[in-house]
Swiss-Prot record:
Location(s) in or outside the cell: Nucleus; Chromosome, Telomere
Family matches, as PANTHER family: TELOMERASE PROTEIN COMPONENT 1, TELOMERASE PROTEIN COMPONENT 1 TEP1
Sorted UniProt keywords: Chromosome, DNA-binding, Nucleotidyltransferase, Nucleus, RNA-directed DNA polymerase, Telomere, Transferase
EC numbers, comma separated: 2.7.7.49
Function: Ribonucleoprotein DNA polymerase that catalyzes the de novo synthesis of telomeric simple sequence repeats. Subunit p80 binds tightly and specifically to the telomerase RNA suggesting its association with a region of RNA secondary structure.
Name the record gives this protein: Telomerase component p80
């Protein structure tokens, strides 16, 4: 495949599919890096694992990742179709890759060779209601590919079509959907398939297929919103005049602190801006276009009846006899005569997001959420800063601190160690820098109205007290240092638990090389949601390296860049202070300043090992791979790297293994010659802490194909 200026083009037909050739332009020199893997299944594992960094869009006309994965799937489907189903189960449950899993599952549903196997794996690969919808949407695309026997993998001919008019649900897909739908409970459906979400889906789809009708609908929705706001204002005015209090809603809002008013105004302006220029999909495929109503209709779903009735919006039975006849013993509650004849609907699930949106970021809200165990582990860790700012009770602090390092909660959290590190940074910032105290945070329209009512109903004396309280808002305060230290210690312990639970001990002596050159300051793909406050390749490399170090029987940690006035070598071995993450990070960043900003691989270090007969079992390289062949100074350097490693292999340790992690995921890696194959030179493209599992498995001699097969069989209870 050729890539020019980061734009994907159609791969050359004459190349074998497993020969991935990336051609880029760098300093007017052509760079060619070839990765060749003879086993189609191993290649498929590698290209799907690369999605850890950034998943493909799958809906663009010429999406390169979709092309590569589809070609790899077609090859494996001819030799071992069941393995594709097993891979989907593995990458969804172990690597937490969602969209690519759904694409692979859809492929299995469509392709004739995988259809006999997918039904027994489907329910373990599809976990959420949204996953089920996405699988069905991908299936519509793959049915189009299947019609041409997968010879045309581009979508230009259908991007502007109204795909809802040509929906296809074949028997295999229908059976899988019916089976999975029965596993969802009403709480899950309440999060993902409410009537309001269905309307939003159809509204966005309308923006692509019928622009004129969409404009009319948008205008009508805006008018309805303004009418509701006016009705609320008039109702409040009337109510207060009847009680002799002429203070209306506008007066009540003015009584609130100006800072709060500013926040409310900012939110309202953002809403207006969104209404003027909402995000519009570029094609029908980029817009979600299926709902659970569609699945019920096309897949003939009839059970569980009560949930089906609610999604379809059928009327509640008028009598108890009709109720029993309709739902029988499967009814979730006894007959309620007050609901007779009314339209049934899936209730919106009570979640922590809804509570915060309605009531604001206050201590009382957080206390209630945490004490009632309504705050999931991941949400709790991501919101530590908000919890600290809200000023929760000591009891709540104690609950949170204990829960952070609870082994079972950590194991089930599926959290990136980078996100744990971000939590430490958030707590440390709150302790050292502090924040401005706030009594009220952003809340939704309903919450704002309730806040206004609260002000209106106060007596004059209470209003004066409130104004006095508000003058104290905005003071610069810091979190108690003792509390902050407890939080940090708890998170550090959680990191150790997470690494120990998910990673076997790496035997022998492991040398970890972390690139700290200037190019490593580039931002990582994935954003705050995936990596938290750890945003650059440098931070990712250091944190990941420290994770590896924790599980090594014996280790050496090196940073490398280029020589400087302070150091005549391009690398430094750093003696780290124990296993604590923050002190180790600080030490590494401090030592980084002694090196230059260029990128040289420390082959001299390997020469030194050879000279001193230092036994090293594993080398782990964490870099953006600017050291790969083709970059500046590489003709000399590249040759030296190969010669140094080959000499060490011949004279000291013939079984040494090298793990090269390309954090940017571009497929660039050092070319070490034919002596190094996929068994002793493992190239990993992309960034994830699941890389740790790969290193552990490969270091122990495990075959990833067999690991995946065994995992999937255990999941479905056949092993």
């Amino acid at each position: 495949m050729e890539i020019e200026n980061n734009q994907a083009q159609q791969p050359k037909a004459e190349k074998l599919w497993w020969e991935l050739e990336l051609e880029m332009q760098e300093n007017q020199n052509d760079i060619q890096v070839r990765v060749k893997i003879d086993d189609p299944k191993q290649y498929l594992v590698n290209v799907t694992a690369a999605c850890l960094l950034q998943e493909g869009s799958y809906y663009q006309d010429k999406d390169e990742r979709r092309y590569i994965i589809t070609k790899a799937l077609l090859e494996v489907a001819e030799s071992d179709p069941e393995f594709i189903c097993q891979l989907a189960v593995y990458i969804r449950n172990e690597l937490y890759i969602r969209t690519t899993t759904n694409y692979i599952v859809a492929f299995c549903v469509v392709h004739k060779n995988t259809q006999p196997f997918i039904e027994k794996y489907f329910n373990k690969a599809v976990l959420l209601p949204n996953d089920l919808l996405e699988v069905c949407e991908f299936a519509q695309v793959l049915y189009i590919f299947d019609a041409t026997e997968f010879k045309n993998l581009y979508l230009d001919r259908i991007l502007s079509q109204d795909i809802r008019k040509e929906l296809t649900f074949r028997k295999c897909l229908q059976r899988c959907v019916r089976s999975k739908f029965s596993e969802f409970n009403e709480y899950q459906l309440g999060k993902y398939c409410t009537e309001s979400q269905r309307k939003k889906t159809m509204f966005r789809y309308l923006s692509v297929t019928n622009k004129q009708k969409w404009d009319q609908t948008k205008k009508k929705r805006k008018e309805n919103l303004l009418t509701k706001l006016q009705a609320i204002k008039e109702s409040e005015d009337k109510s207060k005049r009847e009680t002799g209090d002429i203070m209306n809603v506008e007066d009540a809002i003015k009584a609130l602190k100006p800072a709060v008013m500013k926040k409310i105004a900012k939110r309202q302006n953002a809403m207006k801006k969104h209404m003027k220029a909402p995000k519009i999909p570029n094609s029908t495929l980029e817009s979600k276009y299926l709902t659970f109503k569609d699945l019920i209709k096309f897949c003939h779903i009839s059970e569980p009846k009560e949930r089906v009735y609610k999604i379809l919006g059928k009327k509640y039975p008028k009598t108890e006899e009709e109720y029993k006849a309709a739902f029988g013993d499967s009814a979730s509650a006894p007959f309620n005569p007050e609901l007779a004849g009314k339209r049934m609907k899936i209730e919106i699930s009570k979640t922590w997001e809804n509570e915060l949106s309605a009531k604001g970021n206050t201590a009382e809200v957080w206390d209630n959420l945490i004490s009632s165990n309504q705050l999931p582990y991941m949400a709790m860790l991501r919101n530590l800063s908000n919890i600290l700012k809200a000023g929760v009770s000591d009891t709540t602090h104690s609950i949170v601190i204990n829960k952070i390092c609870e082994p079972k909660a950590v194991e089930n959290s599926k959290m990136f160690p980078l996100q744990f590190f971000s939590a430490i940074e958030a707590v440390n910032e709150a302790v050292t820098k502090g924040f401005k105290a706030k009594k009220r945070e952003n809340m939704n329209l309903k919450g704002q109205i309730e806040a206004v009512k609260e002000v209106v109903e106060k007596t004059d004396e209470e209003k004066k007290d409130m104004e006095l309280e508000q003058t104290e808002e905005g003071e610069f305060v810091k979190v108690n240092e003792g509390i902050g230290k407890q939080y940090i210690n708890s998170i550090e312990l959680a990191i150790k638990i997470a690494v120990n639970k998910n990673l076997d001990e790496i035997k022998g002596h492991t040398a970890i090389f972390s690139d700290v050159s200037g190019s490593m300051s580039t931002s990582m793909s994935g954003g705050a949601k995936k990596y938290g406050s750890v945003r650059t390749c440098l931070e990712c490399a250091l944190v990941l390296g420290l994770m590896v170090k924790q599980r090594c029987e014996k280790s050496s940690f090196y940073i490398f860049s280029s020589p400087s006035s302070q150091c005549n070598k391009c690398y430094l071995e750093v003696d780290l202070p124990g296993d604590e993450l923050r002190p180790s990070m600080q030490k590494l960043l401090q030592e980084k300043g002694k090196l230059g900003g260029g990128t040289d691989f420390p082959y001299e270090c390997i020469d030194e090992w050879t000279k001193n007969k230092t036994h090293v079992d594993n080398i782990v390289i964490l870099s953006d791979m600017m050291i790969a062949e083709g970059y500046s100074d590489i003709n000399v350097r590249g040759s030296s790297i190969v010669n140094s490693i080959k000499k060490y292999k011949d004279e000291v340790n013939p079984n040494i293994k090298i793990f090269a992690v390309d954090l940017e995921g571009y497929g660039k890696c050092l070319n070490l010659g034919d002596e190094f194959n996929e068994n002793n030179y493992i190239k990993i493209f992309g960034m994830s802490d699941s890389i740790l599992k790969f290193i552990s498995a490969k270091q122990g001699g495990a075959n990833m194909v067999e690991v995946i097969k065994n995992f999937a069989l255990q999941k479905i209870g056949q092993k």
